[in-house]
């Protein structure tokens, strides 16, 4: 079997709705192919959640039809954060969990991603087996063996209680005012309740999904509205989740953005303070040098993985460590969850705020972020701009100018047709001009 994936990217199957492969007929067949493979594994039970995109209804029906044709039973949770589906898959002893979401992407995109029975991303061999089944014609099981669909009405309540259980029982969020931005996404009916039930004064925004407003000028990918609201409300801090609840970006009381690197640093330092840190921290190639240096000053080991929470997880498991993060807001805490969980990560930072009696702003000052600029260049076709001589020359020139006081990273996005150009260094103006220079070279080579 070839290890070359045709459909599965770094985070499942994703694309624009109505365009292959995110079409009703393909998703039906994907459900059947997954069902064929999963039926050989055990219970024939699958948990299905989704975010708030209007296309979720269509894709949910197609997916369930395919699973039923393969003889699997589907349990629907309705709109539910990705990490909640991972949790429910474990607690219900299901063979797999499936999430219909395109995470932080616009509403017109959608995707399908799978979790194993342990609540982790599917192993490579299972994904490849599913792709192999997609080459076959659909064969329906006998009528008596067809799968049924049921709905889990208390899914939200179960997950809310789990999230609360990860917050120290001797602490409370009483007298803490929090602005919670749910991006009109899957956390809209969950996150505000978690923090309210722990005692916080919650101001909720991004909690009116209409099918087309997910991630639209709100949430973890655009915190400007949250920054303004935190200052207006004189809140202690703000929390921004992405559309499917696996990314968290925070805002301090002054309106400053606190990214995934800073969040992981705060959590690791607090674990060290309490004598509970197990190993070090895993970041990615995009992790800010400031985080690496900040951890080094504390004597906390740090390694970089490839970009993508899948690769952060691989490094965590290989090293036996518990804390991993991407600066985009994926934070994985393996002593509490099996995948990136934005609500749980936020609760650990809040525990540090309350337990240390320090502000989020003060906690974030332990590390100094280097100026970092990210330029995204859209490309089409099968060409590889990263191999163009003009791009290579541009990168070499910038690296020579930065010397040992900065770095350059170019990579293809695993979820979108983008080339990501990242430049980081001590000199903000040089970093900005260098990123634009390389981005122009990439555009000219596309």
Curated annotation (Swiss-Prot):
Q: Which UniProt keywords apply?
A: Isomerase, Magnesium, Metal-binding, Phosphoprotein
Q: Which residues carry this modification: Phosphoserine?
A: 103
Binding locations of Mg(2+): 103, 242, 244, 246
Q: Which InterPro entries match?
A: A-D-PHexomutase_a/b/a-I, A-D-PHexomutase_a/b/a-I/II/III, A-D-PHexomutase_a/b/a-II, A-D-PHexomutase_a/b/a-III, A-D-PHexomutase_C, A-D-PHexomutase_C_sf, A-D-PHexomutase_CS, Alpha-D-phosphohexomutase_SF
**Which cofactors, if any, are listed as required?**
Mg(2+)
Q: State the Pfam families in the record.
A: PGM_PMM_I, PGM_PMM_II, PGM_PMM_III, PGM_PMM_IV
The record ties this protein, via HAMAP family, to: GlmM_B (MF_01554_B)
Q: What does this protein do?
A: Catalyzes the conversion of glucosamine-6-phosphate to glucosamine-1-phosphate.
Q: Family assignment?
A: Belongs to the phosphohexose mutase family.
Name it. Answer: Phosphoglucosamine mutase
In its UniProt entry, the species of origin is given as: Vibrio campbellii (strain ATCC BAA-1116)
- Gene that specifies this protein: glmM
């Amino acid at each position: 079997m070839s290890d070359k994936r045709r459909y599965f990217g770094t985070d499942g199957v994703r694309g624009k709705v109505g365009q292959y492969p995110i079409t009703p007929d393909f998703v039906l067949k994907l459900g059947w192919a997954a069902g064929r493979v999963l039926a050989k594994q055990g219970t024939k039970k699958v948990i299905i959640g989704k975010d708030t995109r209007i296309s979720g209804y269509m894709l949910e029906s197609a997916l369930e039809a395919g699973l039923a044709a393969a003889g699997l039973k589907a349990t629907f949770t309705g709109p539910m954060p990705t990490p909640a589906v991972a949790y429910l898959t474990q607690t219900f002893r299901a063979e797999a969990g499936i999430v219909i979401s395109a995470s932080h992407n616009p509403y017109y995109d959608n995707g399908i991603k799978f979790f194993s029975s342990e609540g982790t991303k599917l192993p490579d061999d299972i994904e490849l087996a599913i792709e192999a089944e997609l080459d076959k014609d659909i064969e329906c099981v006998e009528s008596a063996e067809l799968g049924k669909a049921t709905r889990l009405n208390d899914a939200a309540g179960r997950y809310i209680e789990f999230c609360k259980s990860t917050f120290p029982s001797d602490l409370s969020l009483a007298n803490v005012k929090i602005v919670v931005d749910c991006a009109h996404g899957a956390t809209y009916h969950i996150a505000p309740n978690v923090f309210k039930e722990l005692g916080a004064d919650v101001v909720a925004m991004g909690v009116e999904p209409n099918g087309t407003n997910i991630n639209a000028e709100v949430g973890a990918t655009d915190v400007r509205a949250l920054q303004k609201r935190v200052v207006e409300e004189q809140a202690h801090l703000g929390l921004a989740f992405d559309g499917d609840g696996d990314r968290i970006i925070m805002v301090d009381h002054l309106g400053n953005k606190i990214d995934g690197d800073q969040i992981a640093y705060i959590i690791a330092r607090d674990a060290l303070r309490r004598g509970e840190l197990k190993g070090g921290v895993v970041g990615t190639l995009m992790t800010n040098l400031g985080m690496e240096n900040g951890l080094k000053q504390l004597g906390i080991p740090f390694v970089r993985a490839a970009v993508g929470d899948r690769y952060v997880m691989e490094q965590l498991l290989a090293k036996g460590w518990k804390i991993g993060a991407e600066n985009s807001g994926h934070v994985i805490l393996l002593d509490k969850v099996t995948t990136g969980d934005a609500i749980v990560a936020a609760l650990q930072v809040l525990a540090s705020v309350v337990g240390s009696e320090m502000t989020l702003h003060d906690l974030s000052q332990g590390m100094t972020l280097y100026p970092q600029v990210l330029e995204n260049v859209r490309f089409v076709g099968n060409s590889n701009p990263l191999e163009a001589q003009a791009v290579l020359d541009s990168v070499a020139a910038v690296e020579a100018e930065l010397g040992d006081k900065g770095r350059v990273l170019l990579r293809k996005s695993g979820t979108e047709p983008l080339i990501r150009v990242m430049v980081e260094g001590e000199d903000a103006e040089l970093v900005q001009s260098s990123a634009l220079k390389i981005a122009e070279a990439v555009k000219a080579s596309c």
